[in-house]
Amino acid sequence: MIREALQKLVGGEDLEQHEAEAVMAEIMDGEATSAQIGALLAGLRLKKETAAEIRGFARAMRARAEQVPTRHELVADTCGTGGDGAQTFNISTTAAFVVAGAGVPVAKHGNTAVSSRCGSADVLRHLGVNLDLTPAQMGACLDEVGIAFLFAPRLHRAMQHAAGPRKELGIRTVFNILGPLTNPVRPRVQVLGVFDAAVAELVADALAGLEVERAFVIHGAGRLDEVSLAGPAQVWEVRPGSVRAGILDPVDLGFERADVESLSGGSPADNARITLEILHGASGPRRDAVLLNAGLALLAAGRAGDAAGAVRLAAESLDSGAARERLTRLIEFTERCKHVEHDNRL
């Protein structure tokens, strides 16, 4: 199938969803050569990916990911694409604890740094979270603690077949936007930040055809893959089979304007400190950004009727200590997993 796909791309034609799914299946199953994979990725980048192609790729990757069992029917994720280059602190990771503290289970899908100095895995490791869990342990953590970190390399082992070509190409490819769409838990609720507005719209269209109940795809002011305080954010509300574009201005929710630099982070140690400060009650633009992004997840989960109410719930999660407690319990649970043999049992 990949040869046929390359012929279409050379001619400037788009792939149908089923064709994209079949091509990604070949890649993930080790049936495509490095040259073919590199040509496909470069061809897609030159042509520009479509929502149908992205959706097809995501479906194939989901099907081949190691599954994470959970008893929760409604699970949220706050994973974004990264790649905005803004070097902010880990906003969506901090927001995940706020969402979990408000009672919505969170399966945080993530990895080490892509374009920043500190990815979600980096900051969590520095906070004391053990990332070396089996899929069964991840699921048990989600059920017991209400939040779990799903370390992408552990769950998407078939990605090894594309690792070499991606590294050799040295350019952004479709894989850079597939991470948030390939969470093995298949969360029904998502807040998904994207580094580019045009790509965000594509991602929203792709997500509408996957298993989602309600999601918000966002592109923040200052070209962030988060809602920022620098200005209005572009927001795409996603429901099954439909996408509605809109604008979210933090000022309308009572927040003060702040420039992107006020959200700056640094090394894993710096970002871990910032996360702890917020969870322990620090005020200011960083807290506000976390409230905004967590509020969107709570709104998508149906915990509030509007954005203002959702932000209030997020503030309660922080101020009551519930968000901080989720981090403490996550650290304790994953520490216990160090002393259990990796045989898919706890």
UniProtKB/Swiss-Prot annotation:
Mg(2+) 2 binds at residues 225-226. Binds 2 magnesium ions per monomer. Keywords: Amino-acid biosynthesis, Aromatic amino acid biosynthesis, Glycosyltransferase, Magnesium, Metal-binding, Transferase, Tryptophan biosynthesis. Pfam families: Glycos_trans_3N, Glycos_transf_3. Pathway: Amino-acid biosynthesis; L-tryptophan biosynthesis; L-tryptophan from chorismate: step 2/5. It is an enzyme of class 2 (transferase). One of its GO terms (biological process) is L-tryptophan biosynthetic process. Gene3D superfamilies: Nucleoside phosphorylase/phosphoribosyltransferase catalytic domain, Transferase, Pyrimidine Nucleoside Phosphorylase, Chain C. One of its GO terms (molecular function) is anthranilate phosphoribosyltransferase activity. Mg(2+) 1 binds at residues 92, 226. Anthranilate 1 binds at residues 80, 111. Anthranilate 2 binds at residue 166. 5-phospho-alpha-D-ribose 1-diphosphate binds at residues 80, 83-84, 88, 90-93, 108-116, 120. Belongs to the anthranilate phosphoribosyltransferase family. This is Anthranilate phosphoribosyltransferase. The lineage of its organism: Bacteria, Bacillati, Bacillota, Clostridia, Thermoanaerobacterales.
